[in-house]
Each structure stands twice: as C-alpha cells, then as structure tokens.
Amino acid sequence: GYISRAPFFSGGVFLMSQSSNEINKDAVNEKAFSFELGYGLRYKWLYVALNAYFTKWMDKTTSKSGYMNNNTELYTMSMTGVNAKHMGVEFDVVARPTPYVTLKGMLSLGNWRWDNNATAYFYNSATQPLANITTGAVASGVGAPDHLKFTLNQDGIHVGGSAQTTAAIGGDVKLLKMLHIGADYTYYARLYADYSLPTYGGGGELTLKEPWRVP
C-alpha cells in the first residue's frame, strides 16, 4: 500500500508548537510504501501464521531539542526529508490441545534503519533561526547563509526507541465455566537507544555512531 499524510503538528507543521505558531516551510507530506506477504494454516485445534513485511518511510519530518551552553534556553533542531526502512518477519501460533487448554506464542524479528542523511536547521525557543547554539546568536533569516545547519550522517543506523526482537509465550487453562487462569511471558531484545545531540556550535557534518543497545 501507499500512504501520504501530513506531518505531526509539533516539530513538523509548526517549528515549536509550545511557544509559537511559526510554520515549518520545509515540511511536506510524509509518504510510506508498504507491503506484507503471509501464509497461515488453520486447523480445528491449531492456528499458525507467518508474515514478512517491508515499509519504506519517505520525507519524514523530525525534531530534536536540547539546551544551549547557558543551560537555560532551549533549542530545536528541525529535519525534513528523512527516510527509513522497516522490514522483518513475524510468526504467531495458537494451539488448543484440549477444550480446556490454550497455548500461544509469537516471534517478531525486525531490521529498522535510517535510510539517508538529513539536513538539520536550528531554532531557539521563539522559533528564531540560530546562527550558533553556543552563544545563542540569531541568524539573519530562515535559510540564510548564517542560519546554523548541518548534515546528519545517519544512513544505515538502527532506528531507536522500539525493540526489534520480540517474543512471547503464554497459556490459559479453563477451570470452570467462568473461571480461567493463565500466564504470559514477553521478551524484548535489540532495543536501541534514540540518539541525542551533544552541544554543537558550528555547521558542517555530524556523523552518528551506532546507538547504544540495551543489554
């Protein structure tokens, strides 16, 4: 399928919705192309499903915030045109060996990575373009030569914030007509931290390293 949607208001349509109505003029509709292929078996006592998916996100608008060197004033870094690839496989099984017992399990293995490098511009809390986040100097205009920007080299880096391996097992026993007892166990792995920006006072390029992976 193909989806085109407006970016989120905060950090997308608006540069900093908490303090200003200034519109992000570079924001465009975010696009996603996705397909899924699956196969399932269903018997009286057993259900098994295997799916593979691929999603390509295009023109995402994202933002990051931090404090300038004075540690009192907030800045926002706005990025547009960010792409990402999400792909993986998913397996589900439900078994009912007797009318009183239900067993279930699932496994999801994903590979989610940023798919390009992005250009970021900096703004202060009043949505004024910044020339330097060390001093807080304001640029002459949005997109002007002195408007602080840099290229964020993130192509191939894992997307953070969501576990890319998930597994679960569980069971349910029917003791009486209206009484069930059950237990579930869920396992999360390959969870990568989202990146944070160091105090940064100049333009040029910033190359991200592979984010920290939660043990």
Where are these regions (language model features)?
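Short glycine/threonine-rich catalytic loop with a Thr-x-Gly-x-Asp
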Residues: 84
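Extracellular loop and loop/strand-boundary signature of outer-membrane beta-barrel proteins
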Residues: 19-25, 34, 74-80, 88-90, ...
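Surface-exposed, extracytoplasmic segments of Gram-negative outer-membrane nutrient-acquisition systems
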Residues: 56-80, 110-155, 194-202
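A generic beta-sheet turn/junction motif
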Residues: 41-45
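Surface-exposed extracellular loop regions of Gram-negative outer-membrane beta-barrel proteins
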Residues: 1-34, 47, 54-77, 186-198
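Conserved C-terminal beta-signal and adjacent last beta-strands/turns
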Residues: 30-35, 94, 98, 102-104, ...
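Small/polar-residue-rich segments within soluble enzyme cores
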Residues: 38
